[in-house]
Amino acid sequence: MGSRPCALGLFCCCSSCFCLCCPRHRPVSRLAAVVGGAAAVPAVVSGVTGLILSPSQSPIFIQPTPSPPMSPLRPGLDLVFANPPDHSAPLGVTRPSAPPLPHVVDLPQLGPRR
């Protein structure tokens, strides 16, 4: 999208940031008027979560915050599919990967405390 002059005579780059005084984003400009000179306020503009960055009173821009990369699989399932099971052992036979734990010694019970 090209740059178009906004109401303040500045240029609105709608692909990277949202100028709140631009006619395209005018419904959100009311939020900017309420916020005033806030440094960073969470906001949602056209479904994009961002921060209102306001170094001065005007203009106020919203810079979209990057979202984490989405994986088609649920977390943890990628490890299951990345490491296929080893079928060298017959079913029902376990092969422990760690040495067995030492036996626990039961301590005698102490008398009731008074």
From Swiss-Prot:
Residues 48-72 are annotated as: Interaction with the capsid protein. It comes from the Viruses. Keywords: Host cell membrane, Host cytoplasm, Host cytoskeleton, Host endoplasmic reticulum, Host membrane, Host-virus interaction, Inhibition of host innate immune response by virus, Lipoprotein, Membrane, Phosphoprotein, Viral immunoevasion, Virion. Residues 91-114 are annotated as: Disordered. The modification Phosphoserine is found at residue 71. Residues 72-114 are annotated as: Homodimerization, and interaction with host AMBP/bikunin. GO terms for biological process: symbiont-mediated suppression of host innate immune response. A motif (PTAP/PSAP motif) lies at residues 96-99. Belongs to the hepevirus ORF3 protein family. Forms homooligomers. Interacts with host SRC, HCK, FYN, PIK3R3 and GRB2 (via SH3 domain); binding does not activate the kinases. Interacts with host AMBP/bikunin and AMBP/alpha-1-microglobulin peptides. Interacts with host HPX/hemopexin. Interacts (when phosphorylated) with capsid protein ORF2. Interacts with host TSG101; this interaction plays a role in viral release from the host cell. Interacts with host SIRPA; this interaction down-regulates the phosphorylation of host IRF3. The PSAP motif is necessary for the release of membrane-wrapped virions from infected cells. This is Protein ORF3.
